Design a protein with these regions (language model features):
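Bacterial N-terminal signal peptides
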Residues: 7-16
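Conserved, well-structured interaction surfaces
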Residues: 39, 43, 51-52, 57, ...
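Short, well-structured active-site flanking segments
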Residues: 23-25, 152-164, 234-235
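Short, small-residue-biased leader/transition segments that mark boundaries at the very start
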Residues: 1-6
Length: 240
């Protein structure tokens, strides 16, 4: 009767709500640790460090128009005017909104995370010399310094992450670290390492950092610490 049908439905619903465990299996056995055990695989991880830099920083008009628009950093070849002239010169004709900064913020920490992964796994690939290994790690450390430099200079205290996130370290209530601490513990050490190990490069080297780029950025970062009340690094800026 209807009573039996109702009882069966209640029993089925109760059984459906019963908790169960799920044992996951990765048939491909793909992990970043495994990827990093070959040189090609590790350099794929290095390439990922550049993604947010191209997508949200210097390969996109949004971030540069907010931070560098209406300055003398932008012009056009032979002063040729285009539809973007007023955009870059006066930020006119744009429709700025919070999407600009939201995308940039997420991209920044995507880049930081990629750099942290590459740095942490730097001992895995079978490079023949430590010079080769450190040159690649130096790319990731240079980029991490650039990400944090921009984050600190635009937003002040931000969350400082220097290790890959794991299930144990994941938090939904991150804390902020003051700018000077980030300079001392991340930006300056990363740029010193990059200055030591990045290759000199040639005039054709335009898409990857070189020793000259690292030295220039190190000097800039050292000078910027003066804004936070420190004179400790001014001589290092002159020597870089």
């Amino acid at each position: 009767g209807l009573g039996d049908v109702y009882k069966r439905q209640v029993l089925f619903s109760a059984l459906s709500l019963h908790s169960c465990t799920l044992e996951e299996y990765n048939p491909g056995a793909f992990t970043k640790e495994a990827l990093a055990t070959s040189i090609d695989g590790y350099e794929t991880l290095i390439n990922q460090c550049y993604f947010a830099m191209e997508r949200f920083y210097y390969g996109s008009a949004d971030w540069m128009s907010l931070t560098e628009g209406d300055t003398d950093l932008w012009t056009y070849k032979a002063n040729e005017s285009t539809s973007y002239t007023q955009w870059f010169w006066f930020f006119a004709g744009t429709s700025p909104n919070t999407t600009y900064t939201n995308n940039w913020w997420n991209g920044t920490y995507d880049g930081v995370g990629a750099c942290n992964e590459a740095i942490a796994l730097g001992d895995k690939p079978p490079y023949t010399t430590e010079e080769e290994r450190n040159a690649k790690i130096a790319e990731a450390r240079f980029l991490r310094a650039v990400y944090y430099f921009n984050a600190v200079e635009q937003f002040g205290a931000v969350t400082m992450l220097t290790e890959p996130i794991t299930a144990e370290t994941l938090t939904y209530s991150p804390t902020r670290t003051d700018p000077m601490t980030i300079y001392q513990e991340v930006i300056l050490p990363d740029l010193r390492f990059a200055s030591e190990w990045l290759p000199t490069g040639t005039h054709a080297t335009t898409t990857t950092p070189t020793k000259k780029a690292a030295l220039g950025f190190l000097a800039k970062a050292c000078l910027q610490t003066y804004e936070y009340g420190s004179t400790e690094y001014l001589q290092e800026a002159l020597d870089a």
